[in-house]
Amino acid sequence: MNTTRDANRLRQRASLSGLALAGSLGLAGCGVLGLAGCGGDNNSSTSGNVKPSFVGTVTVTRHDGANDDLLTAGLGAAGLASASAPSVATPTAPTAAELRRLDIYASYRALVDTAANGGYGTLYGPSVDVNGNATSGSGMVPGVEYIAYSDDGTGQQNVVLLVQIPDAFDPANPCIITATSSGSRGIYGAISTGEWGLKHKCAVAYTDKGTGAGPHDLATDTVPLQDGTRTTRLAAGRTAQFAAPLTDSQLAAFNAATPNRLAFKHAHSQRNPEKDWGLFTLQAVQFAFWAINDKLGAAGMPAGSPLPVRRDNTIVIASSISNGGGAAIAAAEQDTAGWIDGVAVGEPGLNLPPSANVQVARGGVTLPVSGKPLFDYVSYANLFRLCAASSSGVSAAPTQAFFAGAVGWPASVQANRCAALRANGLLSSATAAAQADEALQKLHAFGWEPESDLVHASMSYFEIDPSVAVTFGNALARASVLDNLCNFSFAAVDSAFHPTAVNATSLAQMAALGNGIPPTSGVQLINNLAQGGPTQSKQSVDGSGALAANLDGALCLRNLLTGGDAASLALQAGIAQTLRTGNLHGKPALIVQGRNDALLPVNHGARPYLGLNAQTDSSSRLSYIEVMNAQHFDGFIDLVPGYDTLFVPLVLYEQRALDAVFANLKNGTPLPPSQVVRTTPRGGTAGAAPAITAANVPNFTMTPAAGDRIGVSVSGGVATVSVPN
């Protein structure tokens, strides 16, 4: 294997491998922005099609299905699979249409393995029909898009809402699927979920949930607009998709002290958007009802006539993956007015309350730790995972060879991190090898399954833990970009790893090609306190004089969980605003997740949520499907050599979950019971695994074997979720 060549290939495509991170919403968000009781006042029987009060100016665009379309932006199934991104006539000044095409291309590929051997075009993808049959078609879907901001009147919120209505939408059998963005992405950040809806003639209700990939470039004071194009903050005014809330004097002082920095909406809006992700999902649904009726001509109907598409005649499924899946569950918990009928989500991020009284047992053995919120376990991983990935027991893990070859990282950085952890009293072993083994065992003890072991190296190589910890730390604490929380900032870097002006082409296209959570599109994490001046975090020398990937910053982030200073208290309060209740109000629901998930470990999300739901939802209809040999990032399967031999695509099970919930709501078909699905990896040679077949990815069943059943019991106020080995 040519490690330098392969690592360069990974870095070139890293901006397409968007992170899908966790998120949820507390009930404190209910009732704001015109949603009475998280339901709103646009009742099924209301005559006239009243635009929701939170919706601003609406733009409607037509996509003909030939040169452009809703699902592939005119690229077709083959274009989405192409390794070459769509061209832009003027790279530093892309048009809105060019950015939309780039966004759909990048977002789809970030979420889906588009390699034919991985199942694209045979098991899933635009050219596979609703019955799972491969076709020779392009998969393009004609229709219209309605897009608008949801705002609270300040121009600071400006959450993007988008509704796609296919021409095939059937008013006699109306359906709506939500597709809240995954990760910190923009509006098309769950396009792979939207695909299912469009194929089934449903409207798709998207929201960027107050995140997005377009930054505020503080050096030039330019900001993204709703369509991803850029202008000055002054010219944008209240139409900016995001502008950091700074005065001119604050900005000037910040630029003088810390030049060439960027602010991102998820991290720096100072609004803790995660607390409102469920609310924004409900707003997207309400906007969808209005948009559909508008397209159907409801404005011209006689007074007193019922609207064609209403809550009482429309199937609405809250869906998405990762952050978006957590948002869908949050919306279903908050929905007291009947906007949502069912839930089908993949790998959702779910923050459980500390008093959940839920325990998880695997193979009859109760696990010592489960049900932690995202920032808790990701800040823990941010300390130990880089060291743990060098354990001899996982030396064959994908990307581990890149560390050994010092490709993109300092030489010996893993051993340096292990030694620094020992110097700080966090490890006790004396040798680098023993320290790595100890760090890996710490991850196991904190909730990561052994099945995640081979994923730790790539999680570390792509800096996923520090990126999540820094962005969520800022967001939860409502930190300003001025605060440089834990002495981190965001900037492009020069050849010496010091901050420099961001590349003009990268900046112009970042709203489409970025993922909203640095490192992304050439924007790096910066250690402001590095020896020798601000330096790219993973390349920095910290206070101890070691190249240990900024352990000082990682320790600072971890300490926010228990600290008593203002930033720590703000973060702790922010987490409390994102906790789930577990009560889905009896809605039929399916959660699917891969057992190998190393980003959102099953023991901190789906498994304990099943127990929380059993305690709080007296009419529960929730089932949980745990898929063996599946992990969080399907986009990595063809990107990272070795993933293809080890992992099956979870997207297939996410679509099957939608099939099952839709059949339940449409025909009364029972949902499958909670179970483990035992898949078969493709095997073969890393980077050249044989083609997947249906035999590799069996469906879940209505009658799982006893050894595959996942059980839930409640006794003495404690729910126990029992998962087989």
From Swiss-Prot:
GO terms for cellular component: extracellular space. Pfam families: 3HBOH (PF10605). InterPro entries: OHBut_olig_hydro_put. It catalyses: (3R)-hydroxybutanoate dimer + H2O = 2 (R)-3-hydroxybutanoate + H(+). GO terms for biological process: butyrate metabolic process. Keywords: Hydrolase, Secreted, Signal. GO terms for molecular function: hydroxybutyrate-dimer hydrolase activity. Residues 1-22 form the signal peptide. It is found in: Secreted. It is an enzyme of class 3 (hydrolase). Pathway: Lipid metabolism; butanoate metabolism. The active site is at S322. Its EC number is 3.1.1.22. Participates in the degradation of poly-3-hydroxybutyrate (PHB). It works downstream of poly(3-hydroxybutyrate) depolymerase, hydrolyzing D(-)-3-hydroxybutyrate oligomers of various length (3HB-oligomers) into 3HB-monomers. Belongs to the D-(-)-3-hydroxybutyrate oligomer hydrolase family. This is D-(-)-3-hydroxybutyrate oligomer hydrolase. It comes from Ralstonia nicotianae (strain ATCC BAA-1114 / GMI1000). The lineage of its organism: Bacteria, Pseudomonadati, Pseudomonadota, Betaproteobacteria, Burkholderiales.
